[in-house]
Amino acid sequence: MGPLTFMDVAIEFSVEEWQCLDTAQQNLYRNVMLENYRNLVFLGIAVSKPDLITCLEQGKEPWNMERHEMVAKPPGMCCYFAQDLRPEQSIKASLQRIILRKYEKCGHHNLQLKKGYKSVDEYKVHKGSYNGFNQCLTTTQSKIFQCDKYVKDFHKFSNSNRHKTEKNPFKCKECGKSFCVLSHLTQHKRIHTTVNSYKLEECGKAFNVSSTLSQHKRIHTGQKHYKCEECGIAFNKSSHLNTHKIIHTGEKSYKREECGKAFNISSHLTTHKIIHTGENAYKCKECGKAFNQSSTLTRHKIIHAGEKPYICEHCGRAFNQSSNLTKHKRIHTGDKPYKCEECGKAFNVSSTLTQHKRIHTGEKPYKCEECGKAFNVSSTLTQHKRIHTGEKPYKCEECGKAFNTSSHLTTHKRIHTGEKPYKCEECGKAFNQFSQLTTHKIIHTGEKPYKCKECGKAFKRSSNLTEHRIIHTGEKPYKCEECGKAFNLSSHLTTHKKIHTGEKPYKCKECGKAFNQSSTLARHKIIHAGEKPYKCEECGKAFYQYSNLTQHKIIHTGEKPYKCEECGKAFNWSSTLTKHKVIHTGEKPYKCKECGKAFNQCSNLTTHKKIHAVEKSDK
């Protein structure tokens, strides 16, 4: 045999043979051939670049018509190669076995190293006269093109070659990082040079590795070769399928010794470790914000670019991340692949399932350093922190009002637009908040799930129960800075403050009358509509307001739940009790601006004002 050339370690395929290989096998073939060529260049053997290497570097198919005519197809070659390139085995080793079949004429016995001989050189000294494969390869070349089926051990070389066989002999001059394979160093160098030689004409995006371009192409084609046998979900990368399979097995093989937490993906463990170290190594040049993951920084950069390349085919909505598009599509398909083993509830996003599981475990891993309050969702902690900082980053462009959560701003905007997306199927009434619809539905069902442990009284809303409990405690934590008056509810204090400011932001479009509460405006509108939706089952009398119906019912029951602690007198309305208490305190909060006379009840002041009105008319 003559000196070793690239064609001695290369495999060529016909069109039919190439089509028998799947994408993973084709990509691996490219990488192995390029690596073998680079190794020959490194050893000073390859002089001119073969056509095959030029094709592979340009991302073209590794055959042409001229080469196809030269290669005769052996019987059964298609199966032969596909079998040798099984993904579940070492495909690289399989390719190297195919390479070595070219040297079968030398005889297998010439390739075998006897037990006890640690290098080709030692065996050559002992045997002396073999003319086969060992004559084709130098010691260093044997190391690079070894086949583990025939070679026992090539780890020890002569002193002259030892410097080439270190653990990571290929070192980057730019940053000092070492690699065990020359092709890995070549790929790494592109990070420093930012050469993206593999460009997709469809979207203009460029990559520094051909295999990354191949993967990216699948985004445009929608091609998903890798399907889960368990649930049928398909993926465009085999690594994504392997990661997905762990969901079904429940395996968590990556454990953090420091806190005992386990993960099913090694990258998740790496990310988790940063929580303990607090490291944020990836910084945005645009705004200076730092992240603990490079992928998070990449996603963040899209915010500055404003780019939304991932478009939904169903509704046209665009997203800046492919994962967000995947999640969004499940709205259209109704697909909920993530199921809770505890209660059977299913979700369309894995993160929602993770959050849901904490309901069963009671886990609250996100703790506020300011007050110690813990939460089961990180976003809730972020919102909570704004209570301490007073930050309100979400501002309404219409009126300038600011909010500490985006959801509150979204709800607020509906005041300006008049949008009411949540409709009651029972009566057709619409609401601008989902919580309002939920509360409204209880009117139809009559359900009162919230019960007071103190007195047994039941309520339709949890907020009403919270308000009611304060009656038993007598607590009034909300105090007016203007006049010192205290209230048991923050909403009552907010309403009260408008007395001092005179603010009436809620205006009726029908008659122009303004109110200081949205609920008062809502009740007022019923007057124009003539609607009386709240009907007494006892006598059939109808009312504009639910509170009026509640007060009316007391006539039938004779119930007087509001008792004066001073004298024991009981009343059927809380407002009547409030008026009564003034008798004991001597307080006269209602003052006439005309003459300065004060009264303990608003109605008495109203009556008094008429005296001045009559006096003015007489003049």
Swiss-Prot record:
Keyword ATP-binding on entry: no
KRAB domain: residues covered: 4-75
Gene: ZNF724
Pfam families linked: KRAB, zf-C2H2
GO CC annotation terms, alphabetical: nucleus
Compartment list: Nucleus
The entry's keywords: DNA-binding, Metal-binding, Nucleus, Repeat, Transcription, Transcription regulation, Zinc, Zinc-finger
Transmembrane portions of the chain: none
Keyword Nucleus applies: yes
Disulfide bond positions: none
Any one GO biological process: regulation of DNA-templated transcription
Record GO terms (molecular function): DNA-binding transcription factor activity, RNA polymerase II-specific; RNA polymerase II cis-regulatory region sequence-specific DNA binding; zinc ion binding
Chain positions of all zinc fingers (C2H2-type): 170-192, 198-220, 226-248, 254-276, 282-304, 310-332, 338-360, 366-388, 394-416, 422-444, 450-472, 478-500, 506-528, 534-556, 562-584, 590-612
Function: May be involved in transcriptional regulation.
Protein name: Zinc finger protein 724
Family indicated by similarity: Belongs to the krueppel C2H2-type zinc-finger protein family.
Classification via InterPro entries: KRAB, KRAB_dom_sf, Znf_C2H2_sf, Znf_C2H2_type
